Regions:
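Cys-nucleophile CN-hydrolase/nitrilase-fold catalytic domain and related Cys-dependent amidase chemistry
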Residues: 15, 24-103, 168-189
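CN hydrolase (nitrilase-like) catalytic-core segments centered on the catalytic cysteine
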Residues: 61-79, 145-226
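Active-site catalytic loop in hydrolytic enzyme cores
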Residues: 85-160, 169-180, 243-248
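Short polar catalytic/cofactor-binding loops
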Residues: 8-13
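Residue-level detector of high-confidence beta-strand sites
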Residues: 105-108, 163, 220, 230
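Short, acidic/polar
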Residues: 17-26, 146-151
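C-terminal beta-strand edge segments of enzyme domains
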Residues: 127, 198-263
């Protein structure tokens, strides 16, 4: 068993304040025995595509060096999101900052209709390894609506797929909407899905949800406030679906596909 944490937080256009929030919850998660903590989409810079030119940061920004320091000092891996400036383009990026000081980044590959007018899409679906060896994938917000992404990550070995969101309240009740499809992503691919959303009293609706490889809710909270949600991940349960000869392996559905029929 390992413990993961997901955060519902308020992140505005205040980098310093957002770093303090990162420090606060990373420390709490570490004290509660978590191996990794995941923050919502664009939690460092705030999610403001219309202000990407002003608020986006580069991969060598001091703020990201500070996140790396927080990970090291608290001995916990940290997943944080930000608007990234790279040369003449902008990306929606989520970084994995390991407690040993190493980093990896995932750039959102499937952009929303409005995001396309500002950001450039990433070019790769990545499998990343936590310090403890757990293999993870990342799907950012609207990307969770593409089953092919989750399936690809599962086939490449992902055990947990983190799904940081920046969804506004106007989009509807997050608990009801996620219940329609997030459990199916877990069940069909025999993985854990760990979702979290930005929150405030005006714009973002929040929500945290973790579903297990059986499609059951492992942990959830939709309180109208900032919070940290901790959940245990049963790696033996995941392995039981992927070990040949195990009675559950016949139900690792991605391995039974016939992709030649889909082309």
């Amino acid at each position: 068993m390992i413990k993961i944490a997901v955060v519902q937080e308020c992140a505005h256009e205040n980098l310093s304040n957002n770093l303090e929030i990162t420090q606060k919850y990373a420390s709490e998660a570490a004290q509660r025995g978590c191996s990794v903590i995941c923050f919502p989409e664009c939690c460092l810079t705030g999610y403001r595509p219309d202000k990407a030119v002003c608020n986006a940061i580069s991969l060598n920004a001091p703020a990201l060096q500070q996140v790396s320091k927080i990970a090291t000092e608290n001995a916990i891996d940290i997943l944080v999101g930000f608007m990234e400036k790279s040369d003449d383009s902008f990306h929606i990026t989520h970084g994995l900052f390991r407690k040993d000081g190493t980093r990896d980044y995932y750039r959102k590959t499937h952009l929303g209709q409005r995001e396309k007018t500002v950001f450039s899409p990433g070019k790769e679906l990545k499998i990343l390894s936590l310090t403890n060896g757990t293999r993870i994938g990342i799907q950012l917000c609207v990307e969770t609506h593409y089953p092919e992404i989750t399936q690809t990550l599962a086939l490449r070995g992902a055990e947990v797929v983190f799904a940081p969101h920046a969804v506004p309240r106007i989009s509807g009740n997050r608990e009801k909407i996620w219940s329609k499809y997030i459990p199916a992503r877990s069940y069909d691919n025999r993985i854990y899905m760990a979702c979290c959303n930005l929150w405030d009293h005006a714009r973002f609706g929040g929500g945290c949800l973790v579903t297990d490889p059986r499609g059951e809710v492992a942990s959830a909270c939709f309180d109208d406030k900032a919070f940290l949600l901790v959940c245990e991940i049963d790696e033996d349960l995941i392995a039981s679906f992927r070990t040949l000869g195990n009675k559950r392996s016949a139900h690792f559905y991605p391995s039974l596909r016939r992709p030649e029929l889909y082309e």
